[in-house]
Amino acid sequence: MLCVACCTVFLAVTTWAQKHGSKGDDWPLQNASIGEIEIPAGTSRQVQVTYPTPDGPSFPLKASVTWSIEPAVKGISIDKTGKLTVDADVPHGTTATIHADVEKGRRKLSGKVYVFHPDENPLIGTWHVDTRVACGELQEIKAAATSQLTLRGYDWSFHASQQFWVGREHSIAARLQLAGSYRLDLKSAKIELTPTWPKKQVSHWSYLFKDGDKTLILKPLEPQDDLEAGCGYILLR
């Protein structure tokens, strides 16, 4: 899916430039976006308007931008440089909408902000799925059995919007393996995954943190084609 998107972007860039000559420079502006923004409460980060490229991450758009948050949300602000700041007392799950007026009205963009507290959802972020697995009550680390359906060796992202995906995000090798929504039960240390691509049955998992919050062990509570019985994925960040 991501590969198809990359090829589509490349063809669109080429076609636009061929049709419009020097106006091909409008491609970045016409395809610019803000996207979704995840930010921990009590922190700041720089927000940028970006545009897609065929074989890699998005690039910052070189243009004048006027930033605003509408409607206003208490404790969330953005300055004229695009620096987004969220106060520490903003509740977990709070959302806001950022607006960007690009080049005095040539483009008007918006993006959603999701505020989270790591102690209320420690999964949020991008993890790399180790090629090994953890098995048994002692979490013995060993080589995994070969499987054509494997998710190992990819990245696994949990988002504040309660969405997840497994795959590679950038470069010509971009690939989506699994995506959908998730529900976290912090007290029981369990996760419910609802895959929407490809469509699969809901699955339930237990999780365990090791090495502080740097290693995450995900173990299925139902049989999984990709894992031996009693084994789980090792996720690293």
PLM feature segments, named:
Residues L61-V65:
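Solvent-exposed loop segments of extracellular immunoglobulin-like
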Residues K19-E36, P40, S44-Q46, G56, ...:
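Lipid interaction determinants
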Residues G75-D79:
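Short beta-strand segments within Ig-like beta-sandwich modules, predominantly Fibronectin type-III
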Residues L2-A12:
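Bacterial N-terminal signal peptides
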Residues Y51-D55:
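Short solvent-exposed capping/turn motifs at the termini of beta-strands
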Residues T15-A17:
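Boundary at the C-terminal end of the N-terminal hydrophobic targeting segment
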